[in-house]
Protein backbone atom coordinates (compact mmCIF):
# COMPACT_ATOMS: atom_id res chain seq x y z
CA UNK A 1 0.00 0.00 0.00
CA UNK A 2 2.23 2.75 -1.34
CA UNK A 3 1.36 6.11 0.22
CA UNK A 4 4.44 7.80 -1.22
CA UNK A 5 7.08 9.67 0.81
CA UNK A 6 6.37 10.82 4.35
CA UNK A 7 5.33 14.48 4.04
CA UNK A 8 2.79 14.94 6.82
CA UNK A 9 0.06 15.65 4.26
CA UNK A 10 -3.10 13.59 3.62
CA UNK A 11 -3.18 13.92 -0.16
CA UNK A 12 -4.67 11.82 -2.98
CA UNK A 13 -1.78 9.36 -2.89
CA UNK A 14 -2.31 8.68 0.82
CA UNK A 15 -6.08 8.40 0.35
CA UNK A 16 -5.65 5.77 -2.38
CA UNK A 17 -3.33 3.77 -0.13
CA UNK A 18 -5.85 4.02 2.72
CA UNK A 19 -8.66 2.77 0.47
CA UNK A 20 -6.54 -0.15 -0.75
CA UNK A 21 -5.66 -1.10 2.81
CA UNK A 22 -9.27 -0.93 3.97
CA UNK A 23 -10.46 -3.09 1.08
CA UNK A 24 -7.76 -5.71 1.70
CA UNK A 25 -8.36 -5.67 5.46
CA UNK A 26 -12.10 -6.23 5.11
CA UNK A 27 -12.99 -2.79 6.44
CA UNK A 28 -15.50 -0.27 5.12
CA UNK A 29 -13.54 1.44 2.33
CA UNK A 30 -14.18 5.17 2.75
CA UNK A 31 -10.62 6.51 2.81
CA UNK A 32 -11.14 7.86 6.34
CA UNK A 33 -8.45 6.74 8.77
CA UNK A 34 -10.73 6.36 11.77
CA UNK A 35 -10.57 4.20 14.90
CA UNK A 36 -11.21 0.85 13.18
CA UNK A 37 -8.59 1.52 10.50
CA UNK A 38 -6.04 2.67 13.06
CA UNK A 39 -6.59 -0.49 15.13
CA UNK A 40 -6.05 -2.68 12.07
CA UNK A 41 -2.92 -0.72 11.10
CA UNK A 42 -1.54 -1.15 14.61
CA UNK A 43 -2.22 -4.89 14.48
CA UNK A 44 -0.35 -5.14 11.18
CA UNK A 45 2.52 -3.06 12.54
CA UNK A 46 2.90 -5.37 15.55
CA UNK A 47 2.73 -8.46 13.34
CA UNK A 48 5.38 -7.08 10.97
CA UNK A 49 7.67 -5.63 13.65
CA UNK A 50 11.17 -7.05 13.44
CA UNK A 51 10.67 -8.82 10.12
CA UNK A 52 13.11 -8.38 7.28
CA UNK A 53 12.04 -5.64 4.91
CA UNK A 54 10.62 -3.37 7.59
CA UNK A 55 9.98 0.09 6.21
CA UNK A 56 12.57 2.76 6.95
CA UNK A 57 11.43 6.31 6.16
CA UNK A 58 14.73 7.78 5.02
CA UNK A 59 17.34 5.57 3.41
CA UNK A 60 21.00 6.59 3.31
CA UNK A 61 20.53 9.27 5.97
CA UNK A 62 18.81 11.61 3.54
CA UNK A 63 21.35 11.43 0.74
CA UNK A 64 20.52 10.36 -2.79
CA UNK A 65 23.20 7.88 -3.88
CA UNK A 66 24.19 9.21 -7.30
CA UNK A 67 27.54 9.92 -8.90
CA UNK A 68 26.23 12.65 -11.18
CA UNK A 69 23.13 14.65 -11.98
CA UNK A 70 22.78 13.04 -15.40
CA UNK A 71 19.35 11.53 -15.95
CA UNK A 72 17.67 13.38 -13.10
CA UNK A 73 14.54 15.43 -13.71
CA UNK A 74 14.81 18.97 -12.33
CA UNK A 75 12.14 21.65 -12.29
CA UNK A 76 13.30 25.25 -11.92
CA UNK A 77 10.69 27.66 -10.59
CA UNK A 78 11.57 31.35 -11.11
CA UNK A 79 9.38 33.10 -8.55
CA UNK A 80 6.73 35.71 -9.39
CA UNK A 81 6.22 37.01 -12.94
CA UNK A 82 3.80 39.10 -14.97
CA UNK A 83 1.91 41.58 -12.80
CA UNK A 84 3.41 39.94 -9.71
CA UNK A 85 6.69 41.83 -9.40
CA UNK A 86 7.75 40.34 -6.08
CA UNK A 87 10.21 42.48 -4.13
CA UNK A 88 11.28 45.72 -5.82
CA UNK A 89 14.65 47.28 -5.00
CA UNK A 90 15.21 50.97 -4.29
CA UNK A 91 16.43 51.34 -7.86
CA UNK A 92 13.35 49.67 -9.34
CA UNK A 93 14.79 46.19 -9.95
CA UNK A 94 11.99 43.61 -9.75
CA UNK A 95 12.44 40.23 -8.10
CA UNK A 96 10.62 38.54 -11.01
CA UNK A 97 13.42 39.59 -13.39
CA UNK A 98 16.22 38.43 -11.11
CA UNK A 99 14.66 35.01 -10.53
CA UNK A 100 14.05 34.49 -14.24
CA UNK A 101 17.63 35.37 -15.19
CA UNK A 102 18.97 33.04 -12.50
CA UNK A 103 16.52 30.29 -13.42
CA UNK A 104 17.35 30.35 -17.12
CA UNK A 105 21.09 30.15 -16.49
CA UNK A 106 20.67 27.38 -13.90
CA UNK A 107 18.59 25.42 -16.41
CA UNK A 108 21.34 25.75 -19.04
CA UNK A 109 23.96 24.41 -16.65
CA UNK A 110 21.75 21.51 -15.58
CA UNK A 111 21.07 20.51 -19.17
CA UNK A 112 24.81 20.50 -19.76
CA UNK A 113 25.05 18.02 -16.87
CA UNK A 114 22.59 15.71 -18.63
CA UNK A 115 19.49 16.59 -16.61
CA UNK A 116 15.96 16.74 -17.94
CA UNK A 117 14.97 20.30 -17.06
CA UNK A 118 11.62 22.05 -16.97
CA UNK A 119 10.91 25.65 -15.99
CA UNK A 120 7.58 26.76 -14.56
CA UNK A 121 7.97 29.93 -16.62
CA UNK A 122 10.42 30.98 -19.32
CA UNK A 123 9.06 34.49 -19.86
CA UNK A 124 7.32 37.28 -18.00
CA UNK A 125 4.27 35.21 -17.07
CA UNK A 126 2.30 35.05 -13.84
CA UNK A 127 1.90 31.41 -12.77
CA UNK A 128 -0.25 30.54 -9.70
CA UNK A 129 1.59 28.65 -6.98
CA UNK A 130 -0.54 25.50 -7.30
CA UNK A 131 0.03 25.46 -11.06
CA UNK A 132 3.75 25.53 -10.35
CA UNK A 133 3.41 22.47 -8.11
CA UNK A 134 1.27 20.69 -10.72
CA UNK A 135 3.87 21.39 -13.41
CA UNK A 136 6.59 19.81 -11.28
CA UNK A 137 4.42 16.83 -10.36
CA UNK A 138 3.42 16.30 -13.99
CA UNK A 139 7.07 16.15 -14.97
CA UNK A 140 7.74 13.52 -12.26
CA UNK A 141 10.53 15.77 -11.04
CA UNK A 142 13.34 14.55 -8.80
CA UNK A 143 14.29 18.05 -7.66
CA UNK A 144 12.32 21.30 -7.58
CA UNK A 145 14.22 24.53 -6.98
CA UNK A 146 12.05 27.58 -6.42
CA UNK A 147 14.02 30.81 -6.77
CA UNK A 148 13.16 34.01 -4.92
CA UNK A 149 14.80 37.10 -3.41
CA UNK A 150 14.51 38.33 0.16
CA UNK A 151 13.60 41.73 1.59
CA UNK A 152 13.82 43.51 4.93
CA UNK A 153 12.98 46.88 6.43
CA UNK A 154 16.67 47.33 7.16
CA UNK A 155 18.87 47.85 4.08
CA UNK A 156 21.73 46.25 6.03
CA UNK A 157 20.04 42.83 6.02
CA UNK A 158 21.95 40.40 3.85
CA UNK A 159 22.55 36.67 3.37
CA UNK A 160 21.07 33.69 1.55
CA UNK A 161 18.38 31.43 2.96
CA UNK A 162 16.81 28.13 1.93
CA UNK A 163 13.46 26.66 2.94
CA UNK A 164 12.44 22.99 3.02
CA UNK A 165 9.06 21.48 3.91
CA UNK A 166 8.21 21.22 7.60
CA UNK A 167 4.89 21.04 9.38
CA UNK A 168 4.78 20.40 13.10
CA UNK A 169 7.21 17.52 13.72
CA UNK A 170 7.11 16.34 10.09
CA UNK A 171 9.88 17.57 7.83
CA UNK A 172 11.70 16.69 4.63
CA UNK A 173 15.09 15.21 5.51
CA UNK A 174 16.17 15.30 1.86
CA UNK A 175 15.11 18.94 1.60
CA UNK A 176 16.96 19.87 4.76
CA UNK A 177 20.18 18.25 3.57
CA UNK A 178 19.86 19.87 0.14
CA UNK A 179 19.49 23.25 1.84
CA UNK A 180 22.70 22.61 3.76
CA UNK A 181 24.54 21.54 0.59
CA UNK A 182 23.47 24.58 -1.42
CA UNK A 183 24.29 26.88 1.49
CA UNK A 184 27.81 25.47 1.66
CA UNK A 185 28.27 26.02 -2.09
CA UNK A 186 27.05 29.60 -1.85
CA UNK A 187 29.42 30.36 1.00
CA UNK A 188 32.29 28.80 -0.93
CA UNK A 189 31.41 31.09 -3.86
CA UNK A 190 31.72 34.12 -1.57
CA UNK A 191 28.06 34.81 -0.82
CA UNK A 192 26.95 35.37 2.80
CA UNK A 193 24.61 32.69 4.11
CA UNK A 194 22.05 32.95 6.91
CA UNK A 195 20.83 29.36 7.06
CA UNK A 196 18.11 26.81 6.36
CA UNK A 197 14.56 26.85 7.70
CA UNK A 198 11.57 24.50 7.68
CA UNK A 199 8.32 26.03 6.43
CA UNK A 200 4.83 24.87 5.46
CA UNK A 201 4.67 26.95 2.27
CA UNK A 202 2.17 25.71 -0.32
CA UNK A 203 4.78 24.88 -2.97
CA UNK A 204 6.98 23.00 -0.51
CA UNK A 205 3.94 21.06 0.69
CA UNK A 206 2.21 20.27 -2.59
CA UNK A 207 5.12 19.47 -4.90
CA UNK A 208 6.62 16.00 -4.91
CA UNK A 209 10.29 15.13 -5.16
CA UNK A 210 12.97 16.98 -3.22
CA UNK A 211 11.70 20.56 -2.99
CA UNK A 212 13.64 23.63 -1.92
CA UNK A 213 12.99 27.36 -2.02
CA UNK A 214 16.16 29.46 -2.21
CA UNK A 215 16.50 33.21 -1.60
CA UNK A 216 20.15 34.03 -2.36
CA UNK A 217 19.94 37.85 -2.27
CA UNK A 218 18.22 40.70 -0.42
CA UNK A 219 17.02 43.18 -3.03
CA UNK A 220 16.60 45.73 -0.24
CA UNK A 221 20.37 45.62 0.31
CA UNK A 222 22.27 48.04 -1.99
CA UNK A 223 25.19 45.65 -2.50
CA UNK A 224 22.90 42.74 -3.36
CA UNK A 225 20.88 44.98 -5.69
CA UNK A 226 24.10 45.76 -7.54
CA UNK A 227 25.15 42.08 -7.65
CA UNK A 228 21.76 41.02 -8.99
CA UNK A 229 22.39 43.09 -12.13
CA UNK A 230 25.80 41.57 -12.85
CA UNK A 231 25.86 38.57 -15.24
CA UNK A 232 28.93 37.19 -13.49
CA UNK A 233 26.98 37.13 -10.21
CA UNK A 234 24.13 35.19 -11.81
CA UNK A 235 26.72 32.77 -13.17
CA UNK A 236 28.27 32.18 -9.74
CA UNK A 237 24.87 31.73 -8.11
CA UNK A 238 23.70 29.32 -10.80
CA UNK A 239 26.86 27.25 -10.45
CA UNK A 240 26.44 27.18 -6.67
CA UNK A 241 22.88 25.86 -7.07
CA UNK A 242 23.95 23.17 -9.52
CA UNK A 243 26.93 22.23 -7.37
CA UNK A 244 24.68 21.93 -4.33
CA UNK A 245 22.42 19.49 -6.14
Where do the language-model regions lie?
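Catalytic-site microenvironment of enzymes
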Residues: 1-245
Amino acid sequence: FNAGPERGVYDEEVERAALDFQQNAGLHADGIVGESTLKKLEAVRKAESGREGKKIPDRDGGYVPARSLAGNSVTIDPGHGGTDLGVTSAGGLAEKDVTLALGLRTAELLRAEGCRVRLTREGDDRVPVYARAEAANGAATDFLLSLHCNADASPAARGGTAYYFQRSHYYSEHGRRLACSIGARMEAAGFPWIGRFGRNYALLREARGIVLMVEPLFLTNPDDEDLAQQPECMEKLARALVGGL
